[in-house]
Amino acid sequence: VKLQDEYECFFMVADWHALMSEYAHPKDLKENLISNVIDWLTLGISPRKSTLFIQSHVKEHLELYMLFSFITPLGWLERCPTYKEQLREATNRDLSTYGFLGYPVLQAADILLYKAGAVPVGEDQLPHLELTREIGRRFNSLYKKDIFPEAQALLTKTPRILGLDGRKMSKSYNNFIAISEEPKNIRLKVQGMFTDPLRIKFSDPGHPETCNVHSYYAVFAPEREKEIASLCRQAKIGCTDCKKELAETLVKFLEPIQKKRNELLKNKKQIFNILEQGSRKAGCLASKTISEVKGLLNLR
């Protein structure tokens, strides 16, 4: 949210990316993506400061993706750690598709189409950002012109928060707490979180540095983190009580956010207007980049 005051920011509703992994279930795609935009607005993303747009409404993304695919070696894509991990974890769907293998190329097009100088990412996305830089460098080298800059990563103080089950946080794994989550569901989800595997009995001293529950305290209750860690190491607080306190902290943290979100839900027409205006603005910038690229490739 603070980046809006320092950079010209673009926030993209990645519907094509969503279809790459959920191609068999397009029914709820639109509603889910609009829900994401409402989350952004709720948390402080402002259409007066930033551009919010829908990926599929700016066709230049697809065009640059295709052109990048011509110059991207297969080996670059096959070595992506996220690709290998998701193939292993995908038990109920087939992700061994051309589209899924190539989604980092589309991601590169999403970034380089706007000649982004910086990208806010989590640690798990750093390999993808490096691949984006490699694709940009290769294009610049092949066609003897530095069109694309090397986008730098913007990491937060907590660059990675694991999912409730200790894996990468992902909608695909359903291991997250949504902004719109009801209090009873928050409590149930936190209750099921993985804790210190070495702590079997209450009297066993804990190891908060390896406990996923404790990592959430660092983000949502930093004022309690050190005390909770000390109590855990001395076996003066059990995992159940630790989870209960965290759950109530999250419920309280989300309460005003959910109130604001419910107000935004009442005016979905306004959300679509914001996205329509943003998509037009993004399209104008994207067309300039594509025109430049086509000139280098003798496609005009």
Where are these regions (language model features)?
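Extended aliphatic helical segments
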Residues: V1, V13, V37, V58, ...
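N-terminal Rossmann-like or analogous alpha/beta NTP/dinucleotide-binding catalytic cores
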Residues: V1-A109, Q258, N262
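Structured ligand/cofactor/substrate-binding pocket environments in proteins
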Residues: C9, H25-L29, R48, S56-H61, ...
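Active-site-proximal beta-alpha loop/turn segments in soluble metabolic enzymes
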Residues: L19-S21, Y114-G117, K168-M169
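A short secondary-structure junction signal
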Residues: R79-P81, A116-G117, Q125, S172-Y173
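Conserved nucleotide- and phosphate/pyrophosphate-binding catalytic cores
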Residues: P127, R133-R300
